[in-house]
């Protein structure tokens, strides 16, 4: 299980019917079944009742020190057991609401608002044996678990024998079988549904609106997740209606424990506020096998049933559906899905929901996983670097691996995700504490509630039982299904018995009853400031503290408060030639393979999520998110005028003083916190009317702002911008006019606008370098006006900052009278920036804060009253509440001075005492007599006594408190017998694929333990079954199939990013020690058909140069000579054109009608002269001549491979010579070691330019040789680099050449080149120029240049004509369409626009539109969009006002049912003012005494308008006019007085002085005083009407 999931054993025991009826327990799950008859006794063991329901236990006041106790006694195996139990008041809150819904009709909804206090916890005692813990529910008999002599025993009533009045109800007690040790791993899994982009954009937009309210530091605050849990009808059908409630609470308690684990890094409480149990299917909630549809239906349904307002006790923040349906990813398959939720959907009314499939107690991990997705947590390894290492288990792993002895925890990435989610303010709904009516969890360890057999029945059905001696139960739970043992690779839950006096806890078998002590977390000290995240350009340093002193353990509280601080550093700007910080982060991925290739990554800006790292491969448009968060200090918006930077993945605002969230701004000329007094505006007009080309208009200096450049009137001229470098233009340079738009110029953005012929340039600035304004003259200039704002010259030079201490204003006086204290605080000031952080000033020179007294006039006297003391009597007359009353005056904030009562005479004196409990009659008491003798002589008898009500108060005695009149008495034992009732089996089950071991299973015979050789191996990720491993076969009759599956947690996030944006060549072939793609590998024709090989196919595209090893075509039996080929330069014009003049047209320029590269024969390029197409020409290239002798080329290494980079050479034997035949084609060939010419029967078409450097040579005309060389042609194969021609054409043309001569054999034998004699009168001959190689852009033309003698050496090389030159017809232009703009309206019909430009395809330089007119039609620039009808806005109820008075703000949720489909202009307000009335209220005192005992009197009370903030009365009562004025008087004693003749008063009965004092104190109104002092207190006059019937004025 999980470290941190340590459930306190002192809380809930068993809810009613947790274990199910007795008939549902399989006989193999019980041992030692006994029948007992428990009775209720008192603390001393005296009999009280056969009735086990503790009706006398009533829940006392919450402040009661201890709960009521109950005692039970029973005889078990001849031993007398005494149960001492106490009520568990914390299982459910007083306002617990459990709804049972039937047939979707509200009238049939049963709501349980209270539960009986029949859940008891305590211990069992035995005089001899060791007792232990007991958790018993006494709601319907005794049902639960207790420990005796370190063994677990279960007790429950016998259903076959109902309880009889006056008789003890029979119960059965049975032991729980112990299990062996096990060990293995386990897997389980769920998957979150990704949140929609609309939701993410909505959240980001909300975050930006809340920026001003957010603090810069990271604060750890307690969060309360108020949860609605819904159990569907399948759950009720499976578990049974009485049991499902306790089962669900047990699951949710385990989930709450997971979220209390310290590894999550935040104090989060999972609280169930509402539980809905669906006995029938809901009309509006359709639960199907299709997981997506079920989640969608449930999210809609839970939103409708949610209570409005966070303050409602049953309002929930998230909803969880638990179902027994077998969930499937799609309609019918795959069906291994266990859970579904929306990522980052928490607190969203429509998306804060999840669905989980019930598979037994491991359901808790599924619920925790899906709830983690709602917190915005991604799977570990998905978009982050927290992929599970080995088998280290994490809760958010895509496939959870439960390693032995290692509990599930939260990974570092999960902690960062949830912290970022909360710091962004996306969890505002979690800030409010739950109201009354919250459900408390059962905190008994789940293994105590559900033993191993019960856990097996939950997973596999009623007939399943625990397989003993298979593995350690704390690691893996194995259950029987038929004759085999199955396992879902889950460990048994905490509290499961794993041996004698032991249970499982955190994956380990520990002594039973062991519960680690709860330890609350404590903050460590602040760490040192970290290294600055950047060396320039505003970096971030941070200091943080951890909740590690100590680390919270065992349900201890997590630390609350500030956990991280930030400070900016290295504020100086970076060098301009350095790439951006975001670009540097993208380039870190250049060395990583992406789709099988290496790419150069460039950044892509993302305004919706500016702090995520989005990049794309250079020259490709598709983008990828490479990191979830950029490094601290990365600008949020690259290229904009903004200082905002990213910190921990959140965009933080930076003021001009470079303090986070300071709000400091610059004035219009760049002075931080300035008032514009130092700004100077420069305005000039350029009036030269005539000019040629580009003419300077004026210079805008660096630091200029509010720049405006415009033509005075329309003209055909063009504005241009350039830097101080004459060759560097920002706009409209190089005689090219650009389109309207925004252009980056000198560190700022200029907006270029042209309406008709009138041009304007605007920019907010500031410029980082001087910018020249130019005018490109086309006609007469009507004038150009420009202006800008800059700081005055005296302040333009950069000055070092000056920091000093300054006093701020005096604080407000905290009191209105009685002397208060005002303080004057110090601030650190900078001369230009104003108030800055105190760290910039010298602390040694810091002056002291100033103080002074204020409002020293004395406060008026007022009555001070203390708290009411308890009533002096609890019943009957004569009891009083009393309190102290003093006249005091405030002389300070915390000091009061006592005065004489006369000083408060202007105020009515509050009452010092009032009667209490006089209406409560005191109860009577019971009296008891002595016990009689026992009624029997042996065994159990009865003795009696008398019980009487001692009635001396006139109140009957309480029957519930009446003592018993009879009790048991026990003498020497009598013999008696017991009977045993056998029962059937019950439980629950499921059918899902799982790992199982087939075992010859016998429920009555233990399964033998595997031998050490068959110890389990680590679980593999694959599904392969190793059937041949002998170590997997245990000895004896047990055999293990080990069919393993790993799909409990299915990853719904399919990796769609691997779609190729180009062909991926990931398969590589090793050729000659080099790894090359497969499309470059040499071809391999059949070995009996040697084929001459030209350049390797694809070598030109891949840019691969060098020698190619030959295909292994030649065998020792082959008589055909091999042809040696090498790769050649890619471009035939490389020798004639410079790099600047090389043909450039479209992005991939190819020369028309030329096969390139030409065939190469051992480094010599072969071609055919136009005059004689049948000659195979060999180009001389002395630079490629190897220095090694010809014979060295045939040397082989020991393994038979040729040495050196060249191919195998020709054999040394000469070619046989025969006379030439006119019908056969002949070819000259110089058989030097570096050049071989062969007759192929093909015509090779090559670039004519090369023929100037070629010379004809002749090959032998031996038919045998020709047959051998032409073999490839006759068999239909051809070299990849040669172009065949028909044989007829070849033969015809070759017969026309008289210069064809056979080779001399000696030349071939010697291997020497042929020497040709120089010709006389030779001259250069040129052919016609070819057409331009391109139709647009920069191309090339060439011509044939050759010597008339056929040998270039006969002609003068210095006078050789140019064979090629470049040509340029026109620019290659094409329409380039930009991205469509955002639709002007999301619904109701809108339009989107885009920019369409005519550009040069070479460098994407903008051109005038006429360049593209010959081509395709210009693409449209506008299209319709957002045609769907608009939906109405959804508004929630208003939340509680932020202030109780004095003006506050109310908020409500305003959202669109379908994001983007609502009219933005009609969006309702989400805030409104509230409680605008002043902070005053009427305060009333207690009603005074009635002015008359009868005949109509008046009661009066004090009514004052009091300021609730100061606690003082307001002089103006109109300030309380927002409340109804309470009555200050009311009539009383309206009954008529009896007409009794007053007795004659002779004298006062009390002493005269005492009566005079009472009269002065106003006591004569009291009837008793008036009767005792009849002379001093004359009777009331009846002639004057009472003022009690008059309305007293309000003021």
Curated annotation (Swiss-Prot):
A molecular function (GO) held by this record is: metallopeptidase activity
Region spans: Disordered? 165-218, 989-1035, 1077-1121, 1179-1234, 1255-1315
**Gene3D superfamilies recorded:** 2.60.120.830, 3.40.1620.60, Collagenase (Catalytic Domain), Thrombospondin type-1 (TSP1) repeat
Domain named Disintegrin: residues: 444-519
- The reply on keyword Repeat is yes
What are the disulfide bonds? 299-353, 328-335, 347-429, 386-413, 456-479, 467-485, 474-504, 498-509, 532-569, 536-574, 547-559
Query: What remark does the entry make about the cofactor?
Result: Binds 1 zinc ion per subunit.
Keywords from UniProt, A to Z, are: Cleavage on pair of basic residues, Disulfide bond, Extracellular matrix, Glycoprotein, Hydrolase, Metal-binding, Metalloprotease, Protease, Proteoglycan, Repeat, Secreted, Signal, Zinc, Zymogen
Q: What's an example GO cellular component term for this entry?
A: extracellular matrix
Q: Which GO terms describe its biological process?
A: cellular response to BMP stimulus; cellular response to interleukin-1; cellular response to tumor necrosis factor; chondrocyte differentiation; collagen fibril organization; extracellular matrix organization; negative regulation of chondrocyte differentiation; ossification
Name the SMART domains for this protein: TSP1
**InterPro entries per record:** ADAMTS/ADAMTS-like (IPR013273), ADAMTS_ADAMTS-like (IPR050439), ADAMTS_CR_2 (IPR041645), ADAMTS_CR_3 (IPR045371), ADAMTS_spacer1 (IPR010294), MetalloPept_cat_dom_sf (IPR024079), Peptidase_M12B (IPR001590), Peptidase_M12B_N (IPR002870)
**Domain annotation PLAC: ranges:** 1541-1581
Which residues fall in a compositionally biased region of kind Low complexity? Answer: 1220-1232
Supply the domain comment.
The spacer domain and the TSP type-1 domains are important for a tight interaction with the extracellular matrix.
Summary of subunit composition and partner proteins: Interacts with COMP.
Tell me the protein's name.
Answer: A disintegrin and metalloproteinase with thrombospondin motifs 7
Task: Please report the organism this UniProt entry assigns to the protein.
Answer: Rattus norvegicus
- Gene of this entry: Adamts7
